[in-house]
């Protein structure tokens, strides 16, 4: 007799099925705790990873059709290639001897440990046979509540800081803004097929206003621009361009009111960017944007010199030599013990072209899996890949332990939500 794996356990132990049913809520809670209570979020992350590792061998024995099994193997291999290459790079190149570079080496080691720990968390929803699922309305309500609650927590912190840009928990303001965008976009994504009632439209408008103000509170220019762009695209995709004049009038009034409430913060960040650009054009790179431009220049030089990868220590020596030769602005050395503020340049400057290829395989794995699977996960995969690609242009997300844990739990959340929304019958909340 063939062993049915976790499917047999689901029949004999209904409580286990209920636990799996609650997995999306636990993952959503973990994502929220990473932002608000990082220590609790890390604890929950490792608990979920341990439970997934415990039940993953049972789930692997279930009967699957050929196509789902092939797709599962595709995504599994993409995850393994990304994690395996980073581990091989850490093993091959020696650790830095300069104490000032220890934080960089530790960040890479911790990041790889997090993704390795998260591997069972990502694989279990792929192979899990459990059929008990949350209702689509329940999942939507949970994500909308999380988005609204995080927005209010951010606005409360902003009020207490007297209008100064704020982060959440131990996360810096920029990272907090990126993770808030992920939660906010996922909440709006779940509204796509529903036909809302009039009072629900009002609630959705209030939710969007809260989301926008929470991004403004972080003072992150990239997150603000991306949020407005994605929101505009989502509205056009959902409703089309041709609407009544009342719809445009209400949208214009809401936009003007939101801009008026947030103009002090938005205007200050715009003026700061203009000042930084003027200073950089005059040769002063000791500003927020000036340091970023210098770091990007340093990353380009590193890729040209060592396209196949190098150690952290070797890259630092190269940067000092370039500054000494006058080929690089000395502002690039200010953050030598952090990162290059660009995901691709950070990967290429250390892990070379093979490292960039492994990261591309990771993203393409989600893309191909989502495209072939279709339904909800196709939209989620597009959004998930865009999160890493777009925000990775202005920061290095993989080296932040909170963002790495969030990214792993968020991907697992999408894998759990996919069958919920693919199998739904209802069209109204």
State the predicted function of each range.
Residues 217, 238-282, 297-304:
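A membrane-periplasm/extracellular boundary helix in multi-pass inner-membrane enzymes
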Residues 29-32, 116-162, 170-239, 261:
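Alpha-helical transmembrane segments of multi-pass inner-membrane proteins
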Residues 87-99, 154-164:
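Juxtamembrane "helix-exit" motif on the non-cytosolic side of transmembrane helices
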Residues 286-290, 294, 304-351:
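Long extracytoplasmic/lumenal interhelical loops at the membrane interface
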Residues 1-96, 125-137, 141, 190-199, ...:
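Transmembrane signal-anchor hairpin modules in multi-pass inner-membrane enzymes, especially those
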Residues 383-393, 397-429:
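Transmembrane alpha-helices of multi-pass inner-membrane enzymes
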């Amino acid at each position: 007799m063939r062993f049915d794996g976790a499917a047999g356990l689901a029949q004999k132990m209904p409580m286990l099925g209920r636990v799996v049913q609650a997995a999306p809520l636990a993952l959503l809670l973990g994502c929220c705790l990473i932002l608000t209570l990082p220590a609790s979020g890390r604890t929950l992350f490792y608990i979920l990873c341990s439970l997934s590792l415990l039940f993953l061998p049972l789930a692997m024995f279930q009967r699957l059709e050929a196509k789902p099994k092939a797709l599962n193997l595709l995504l599994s291999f993409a995850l393994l290639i990304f994690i395996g290459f980073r581990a091989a790079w850490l093993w091959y190149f020696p650790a830095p001897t300069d104490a000032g570079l220890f934080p960089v080496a530790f960040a890479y080691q911790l990041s790889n440990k997090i993704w390795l720990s998260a591997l069972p968390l990502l694989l279990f929803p792929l192979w899990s046979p459990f059929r008990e699922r949350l209702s689509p309305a329940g999942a939507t309500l949970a994500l909308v509540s999380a988005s609204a609650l995080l927005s209010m927590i951010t606005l409360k912190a902003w009020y207490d800081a007297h209008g100064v840009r704020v982060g959440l928990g131990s996360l810096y303001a920029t990272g907090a803004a990126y993770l808030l965008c992920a939660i906010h976009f996922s909440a709006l994504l779940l509204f796509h097929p529903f036909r809302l009632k009039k009072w629900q439209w009002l609630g959705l408008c209030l939710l969007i206003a809260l989301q926008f103000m929470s991004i403004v509170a972080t003072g992150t220019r990239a997150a603000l621009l991306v949020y407005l762009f994605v929101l505009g695209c989502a509205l056009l995709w959902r409703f089309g361009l041709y609407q009544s004049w009342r719809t445009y009038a209400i949208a214009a009034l809401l936009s003007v009111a939101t801009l008026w409430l947030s103009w002090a913060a938005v205007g200050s960040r715009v003026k700061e960017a203009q000042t930084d650009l003027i200073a950089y054009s005059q040769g002063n790179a000791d500003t927020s944007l000036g340091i970023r431009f210098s770091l990007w220049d340093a990353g380009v030089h590193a890729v040209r010199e060592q396209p196949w990868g190098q150690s952290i220590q070797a890259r630092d020596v190269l940067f000092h030599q370039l500054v000494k030769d006058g080929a690089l602005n000395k502002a690039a050395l200010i953050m030598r013990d952090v990162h290059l503020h660009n995901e691709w340049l950070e990967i290429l400057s250390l892990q070379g072209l093979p490292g960039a290829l492994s990261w591309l395989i990771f993203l393409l794995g989600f893309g191909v899996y989502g495209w072939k699977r279709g339904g909800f996960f196709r939209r989620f995969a597009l959004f998930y890949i865009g999160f890493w690609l777009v925000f990775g242009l202005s920061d290095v997300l993989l080296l932040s332990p909170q963002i790495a844990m969030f990214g792993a739990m968020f991907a697992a959340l999408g894998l759990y939500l996919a069958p919920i929304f693919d199998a739904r019958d209802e069209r109204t909340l």
